[in-house]
Amino acid sequence: MVRVKRGNVARKRRKKILQLAKGYRGAHSRLFRVANQQVMKALRYSYVGRKQKKRVFRKLWISRINASSREKGVTYSTLINSFKKSKINLNRKMLAQIAVLDCSTFYKLIDDAKSPN
């Protein structure tokens, strides 16, 4: 029977996991088995976090647009509807940036959207 020799492969695999676990406290950065569990958990959290980030930013943009548009007396939903009807194709990220950084332009956009074409 042939002897299985995988010292290099196993060492590289363990070293890679321990490298990813650098900065964790206690055994989580030193012991392979515990570190492996923590790295798997961390990678799972980072994957989920990347998906949640998109939701969180969209919520933020919507709340900023809503706050700025209510100063002008228009709700968010009616504003977006009027933008769609008047074919103003600005996404929520751009609208939020305009609302925060340049209020006068944002108010002009609202007036343009309100006025019947």
UniProtKB/Swiss-Prot annotation:
A Pfam family that the UniProt record links to this protein: Ribosomal_L20
Record-level Gene Ontology MF annotations: rRNA binding; structural constituent of ribosome
One Gene Ontology cellular component annotation held by this UniProt entry: ribosome
Subcellular location: Plastid, Chloroplast
Gene3D superfamilies: 6.10.160.10, Ribosomal protein L20 (1.10.1900.20)
Record-linked CDD domains: Ribosomal_L20
PROSITE patterns: RIBOSOMAL_L20 (PS00937)
Keyword field contains Cell cycle: no
UniProt GO BP: ribosomal large subunit assembly; translation
UniProt keywords, alphabetically: Chloroplast, Plastid, Ribonucleoprotein, Ribosomal protein, RNA-binding, rRNA-binding
Annotated InterPro entries: Ribosomal_bL20, RIBOSOMAL_L20_CS, Ribosomal_protein_bL20_C
Taxonomic superkingdom: Eukaryota
Principal place of residence: plastid
Function: Binds directly to 23S ribosomal RNA and is necessary for the in vitro assembly process of the 50S ribosomal subunit. It is not involved in the protein synthesizing functions of that subunit.
Family, per entry: Belongs to the bacterial ribosomal protein bL20 family.
The protein's name: Large ribosomal subunit protein bL20c
Gene name for this UniProt entry: rpl20
